[in-house]
């Protein structure tokens, strides 16, 4: 199924999404000035914004409208997408059910944003930039199963994982993670404290863990082909959660066609 690089969906996927959104939102105004963009145009503008993180003034110029028109279209479409694709959302319970007895992998990733003077807690010392952090879970085939809601960029991966209330649900028997999750009860590499050296068993365990962890990095990279997730988010932080939910649901919606 050929994907349109501009909007991140195939023609079939876009048609299905358009029908769902059309049922979820009343786009044409009954009073006041008519909208400058049709529903189809507004949806494509929003998908283009998600896929490429193009500035709104450039999108406005491309479509012959003002920047506020683009801003309004994106704000409305984000909420409409969240409503239209709600069935594709996944809870932690859904993950455990889908995974069954399979081993899964977890990792955290920072989604960068502009540095706001009134939001110092967005600063990540690990990444040396500002953003929102998310927890990702995939299976050993690299199939993405879950993405958590955003937390502040300053939040350590172990703390973010514990806030999911996932301890006990995932253990060293069914989840692999990196050293950032030591103490969370999942399988992690053994840390070489004070360079005292590792035993042969420790080295074999570390090799096993590191050999299987690459799949989560691949899953995260695939999600971040929505460039809005990979490059700086420029809008106000108050809009981030809705935008993220829309992109996450779009990604799982797209996966349902595989």
Where are these regions (language model features)?
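Charged, often Cys/His-bearing segments associated with DNA-binding zinc-finger transcription factors
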Residues: 1-31
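Short secondary-structure boundary/capping segments within folded domains
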Residues: 6-8, 34-37, 48
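Ser/Thr-centered flexible coil motifs
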Residues: 10, 38, 199-201
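A short glycine/serine-rich beta->alpha loop
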Residues: 29-35, 233
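Short, amphipathic alpha-helical "recognition" segments used to contact nucleic acids or chromatin
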Residues: 38-52
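Short, well-ordered secondary-structure "scaffold" segments embedded in the functional core
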Residues: 49, 58-258
